[in-house]
Amino acid sequence: MNLNLLQKKTTVIKDPYPHVVIEDALPWDVYEELENTFPENAVLSTEPLDQGICYRWKADKLLQEVYKPQIWREFCAYHTSVEWFNSVLELFKDDIPPQLNYNNQAHHVGARGWADDSVTFWTDCQLVMHKPITETTSRTPHLDNPMEIFAGLLY
């Protein structure tokens, strides 16, 4: 089963910042299985953030929980892997500063909360839920962590 969100050929859009939009990024049967097995109760059991509107289940939990549907463990494992990291860097190679000096060395990449402190680049895969808010949006314009090289969203 191919869980790679970049399995379709895509072009980097440069304006207003380097990004990609991939319609139907996963085969429908894979997406449907992820949707049908989404661990809503587990995500909602985490400590709420952002004044109680945001719940996050991070890679350290997704990679360790034995009761989790296998597809979610595999999805998280792939999207925190060296292979995934390399594919994203390859896609955005013209836009990533050379100062990062990654040199494609596997021991420099590890999943946040799972890898030890010796890695240079930490990856993460999170399941996030926001409380429904009817008056306004729960996410105003913002910058994520300035230490992040990239972030991706799957809806």
Where are the regions that the model predicts?
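Fe(II)/2-oxoglutarate oxygenase catalytic core
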Residues: 1-155
